Amino acid sequence: MALDPAKQKAIDMALAQIEKQFGKGSIMRLGEQMSRLNVEVIPTGSVALDVALGVGGLPRGRITEIYGPESSGKTTVALHVIAEAQKMGGVAAFVDAEHALDPVYAQALGVDIDNLLVSQPDTGEQALEITETLVRSGAVDVVVVDSVAALVPKAEIEGEMGDSFVGLQARLMSQALRKLTGAISKSKAVVIFINQIREKVGVMFGNPETTPGGRALKFYSSVRLEVRKTETLKSGQEVVGSRTRVKVVKNKVAPPFKQAEFDILYGQGISKEGSLIDIGTELNPPVIVKSGAWYSYGDLRIGQGKDNARDWLRQHPEVAAEIEQKIKERLNVASLPVKYADEEAGDADV
């Protein structure tokens, strides 16, 4: 629709004044550059989770919260995102507020620990200041904060053990996120906050679980992932890993409430080969054919039982890469097979 020439001239002058005062790109027409509407992502290292997210990974320029019970795989998922970013030539930082990062495990997951920036801050304020500085540099692609529960305000650290500091951490997070959100959007960084789970006292109905740090992170996060261990994986009598379910509780860049399941193997992290087998057999027609206990790819019989098929793919990375490429070529991310989780009323309260 053509605007009145006088009105168009007034708008152009206003846009020019805004750009002169605040910089180029501070205001634009939404459809001016279609490329801006495409969501840039960093893969998670799990094909199944990339599918559930709907866009192929975690969106750049956005905040992601990963939460769940202890030892459910939260840090493992975050470390895989770091590894994927580094493979793409990106720079990653890990703000270790829990002082619990294991460099040997990180390296086993594919993280280049020689080039990983690590900080172990003393206070919550220090951790969030470091995060802001890294984001504003514009040179860091992924920043992981582990964890929100460990971001202890300076006043609490300097106070006595029995002192009460109600709402102090929530106010700290709220203030920090107000400052961070604009900088994150401009820098195109993926900022991941790992969080724990607490239980609200006296809840009779609904979900009693909540996450520490107040409500601000829930609002500012574009993606929220709930990570839970569903079963233990065994090889004979030996425990070798766990089956993990990740539910996309909130998603501002694609439809939410999808879920992904994958194997986390001890000492190896997310089994990419296992995810390929899961998705490859679910496609119609399947990329990987399951006949009885045997798995086949084309004319190749890749193993009897999932464990053997997974080991075979690990030993033949060129075939695994070919299968992954076929899956990506066959279907767009949005149309890949995903399982929808039940939309429970209690999810909004976590």
From Swiss-Prot:
Protein name (database record): Protein RecA
Subcellular location: Cytoplasm
Family statement drawn from the similarity comment of this UniProt entry: Belongs to the RecA family.
Record keywords: ATP-binding, Cytoplasm, DNA damage, DNA recombination, DNA repair, DNA-binding, Nucleotide-binding, SOS response
Short name of one Pfam family: RecA_C
Cystine pairs: none
One MF term in the entry's GO annotations: ATP hydrolysis activity
UniProt-listed HAMAP family: RecA
